[in-house]
Amino acid sequence: MIKELVDNLIKIKQDFAQNYTGNAHIQEILPLKPSKEFPIDTQHLEQLHLFAQKNPIYLNSFEKNILDFPCIVYEGDINEYWLNSIKHGSSCQPFYPTWIMSAYVMSLVAKKIGYSELVDIGSGDGRIAYCGKILDFDSHSIEIDDVLVELQNTICNDT
């Protein structure tokens, strides 16, 4: 299941990257519904969409078939968060989020190999810890940037 999910995720990401014609600073794609190619628990997928819908980073969304897979494209802007994150002398890497599906698959792999706890240090908007929580991990998010902490609080309160 995981290999098929990863293979199909790579395919739609590559096709999307080659054919995207928008101008949003950041884009995210999520399958619209579970399928044979994307065998994701329905409630988990709904939670991933809820994360994107309630995340202030994303300003727009629309349905799009990518390689005949119905998906939702979320478009947004992280400039405010990226610029704020480089103000910290302790910042080694400015905020640039992992794709939600990538965070979910990474957490899924960790669960499959037997982990039950997840700690994400420098967690940005908290998506990795959020995915861990969906999969019943004892999940923790550590972030020092006050603006990103507020972003996480907003998302947590709304999801």
Locations of regions flagged by a protein language model:
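Conserved class I S-adenosyl-L-methionine
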Residues: 114-124
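Conserved SAM-binding motif I beta-strand of class I
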Residues: 138-143
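Active-site catalytic pocket residues across diverse enzymes, especially alpha/beta-hydrolases
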Residues: 110, 135-136, 156
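Short, catalytically relevant binding-site loops at active-site mouths
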Residues: 124-128, 146-149
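Conserved SAM-binding loop of SAM-dependent methyltransferases across substrates and taxa
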Residues: 125-137
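S-adenosyl-L-methionine
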Residues: 2-113, 145, 149-159
